C-alpha cells in the first residue's frame, strides 16, 4: 500500500485505470498458463501495458507527501500474525498524517506492480542468501504442520511466479476493514485532543465481516521424528531441541518467562550461559517464538570447534534444563533474574520504537495494555513453586 490511491500517485486515474485493469487480467491469465512460450508472450504484453500505465503514475508520491509533513522511516513488515505499516512524524502534522494514511487504506491502487514484484524477488533472494533461513523454514514446516505457521511468509518461488492481482484485491477487501485493524500512536500524543481528527479520517474506513479464527491442534513434539538439517557452515556442528510453550495469554506465561531467563538472559548469567562462559560449548541459547496461537522454545547449541561432540553438547544443555526443572538453583539467582527481567520490561517501555512494537504485539494477540504494564509486577510475583 505504498503506490498511492485513485487520488495519490497518478496524474489522471480515469485514463490510468483501463491499463491497470488490463495488467491485472494478464497476471491472472499468466497464473493459469504453464507453457513457457505462452508465458513469455504474456509477460511481454504485461511489460508493454506496464509502460503505458507508467505514463500516468507518479512514483513515490505518497512517500513524498509523508516526508513533506515531517514523516521519516516510512516502511512496513509482515509477520505470521500481522501486517504493520509504520513511520515516525512530527506531532504538529497529526491532521495531515491521519488524512494521508486513512486515504491510503480506503482506496489503494496496485500500480507499478511489475517493479514491486521484482523488489519482492530481490527480498526473497536476500533471505535465500542467509544460510540459516532454509533450515529454519524446514523446521517450522514440521513443527507447525497443519497450521498457517508452517508456511514461509514471503511465499514460494512458484507463488511469486504466478501472482494474481485479482486475489490481492480480494484479500484487501476481506481483511483491510476497520474492525480488523488497529491504529497505534505512541509519543507526544494527547488522545482526547485528537479524537475528532481520528473519527473524521480513520472513521471513514468501512467495516466488514471478519471470520472468527479457528483454533488448531498441533501434534505433540514427541510424535515428530528427529530432524536432520544441514547447515552450510564448514567445521561447525550444531543441534537443537524444541519444546512447546505457553502463549502470552496463558496464566503461566510469566512463570515461563522467568524460567527462560534462568536459562539465559541479557546479563549472561543463566544456566545455559554458564556453559558458554566456562568454554564447555561454543554457543548455547534458549529462544522462544511467541506467535499468537502457539509458542515454542528452541534450545540451540554449538559444540566447541573443531572436535567438540554434538551429543555431549546436547547432554550438557539437557542437564541444565533438568536443573531448572528440579529447582536446582539458589534463591539469590532466582531473585536477581526476576529483577533483571523487570528492568528489561521497564526499559523496553521507555524506548519509543520498542514501545510501539510492544503495543503492536499486544493489540494483535488480544492483550490489554494493563497486561503489558503489569508485566514487571507479575514477574516479581513468580515464586519457586
Predicted regions and their residues:
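Short, surface-exposed beta-strand/loop micro-motifs that present aromatic residues
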Residues: 169-174, 223-231, 288
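An aromatic/glycine/proline-enriched structural segment found at the starts
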Residues: 104, 108-111, 125-128, 145-153, ...
Amino acid at each position: 500500500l505504498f503506490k498511492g490511491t485513485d487520488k495519490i500517485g497518478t496524474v489522471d486515474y480515469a485514463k490510468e485505470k483501463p491499463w491497470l485493469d488490463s495488467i491485472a487480467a494478464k497476471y491472472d491469465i499468466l497464473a493459469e498458463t504453464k507453457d513457457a512460450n505462452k508465458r513469455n508472450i504474456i509477460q511481454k504484453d504485461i511489460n508493454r501495458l506496464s509502460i503505458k500505465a507508467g505514463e500516468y503514475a507518479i512514483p513515490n508520491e505518497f512517500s513524498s507527501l509523508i516526508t513533506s509533513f515531517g514523516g521519516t522511516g516510512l516502511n512496513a513488515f509482515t509477520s505470521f500474525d500481522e501486517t504493520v505499516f509504520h513511520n515516525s512524524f512530527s506531532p504538529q502534522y497529526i491532521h495531515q498524517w491521519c488524512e494521508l494514511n486513512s486515504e491510503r487504506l480506503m482506496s489503494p491502487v496496485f500500480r507499478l506492480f511489475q517493479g514491486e514484484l521484482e523488489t519482492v524477488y530481490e527480498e526473497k533472494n536476500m533471505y535465500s542468501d542467509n544460510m540459516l533461513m532454509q533450515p529454519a523454514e524446514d523446521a517450522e514446516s514440521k513443527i507447525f504442520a497443519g497450521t498457517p505457521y508452517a508456511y514461509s511468509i514471503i511465499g514460494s518461488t512458484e507463488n511469486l511466479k504466478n501472482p494474481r492481482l485479482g486475489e490481492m484485491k480480494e484479500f484487501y477487501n476481506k481483511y483491510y476493514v476497520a474492525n480488523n485493524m488497529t491504529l497505534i500512536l505512541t509519543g507526544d500524543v494527547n488522545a482526547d485532543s485528537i479524537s475528532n481528527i481520528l473519527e473524521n479520517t480513520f472513521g471513514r474506513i468501512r467495516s466488514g465481516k471478519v471470520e472468527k479464527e479457528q483454533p488448531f491442534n498441533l501434534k505433540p513434539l514427541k510424535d515428530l521424528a528427529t530432524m536432520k538439517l544441514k547447515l552450510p557452515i564448514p567445521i561447525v556442528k550444531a543441534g537443537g531441541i524444541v519444546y512447546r510453550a505457553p502463549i502470552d495469554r496463558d496464566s503461566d506465561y510469566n512463570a515461563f518467562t522467568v524460567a527462560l531467563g534462568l536459562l539465559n538472559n541479557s546479563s549472561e548469567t543463566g544456566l545455559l550461559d554458564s556453559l558458554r562462559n566456562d568454554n564447555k560449548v561454543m554457543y548455547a541459547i534458549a529462544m522462544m517464538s511467541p506467535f499468537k496461537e502457539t509458542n515454542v522454545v528452541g534450545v540451540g547449541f554449538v559444540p566447541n570447534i573443531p572436535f567438540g561432540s554434538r551429543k555431549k553438547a546436547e547432554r550438557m544443555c539437557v542437564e541444565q534444563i533438568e536443573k531448572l526443572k528440579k529447582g536446582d538453583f539458589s534463591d539469590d539467582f532466582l531473585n536477581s533474574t526476576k529483577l533483571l527481567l523487570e528492568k528489561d520490561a521497564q526499559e523496553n517501555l521507555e524506548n519509543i520504537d520498542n514501545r510501539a512494537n510492544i503495543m503492536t504485539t499486544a493489540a494483535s494477540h488480544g492483550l490489554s495494555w494493563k497486561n503489558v504494564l503489569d508485566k514487571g509486577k507479575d514477574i516479581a510475583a513468580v515464586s519457586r513453586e
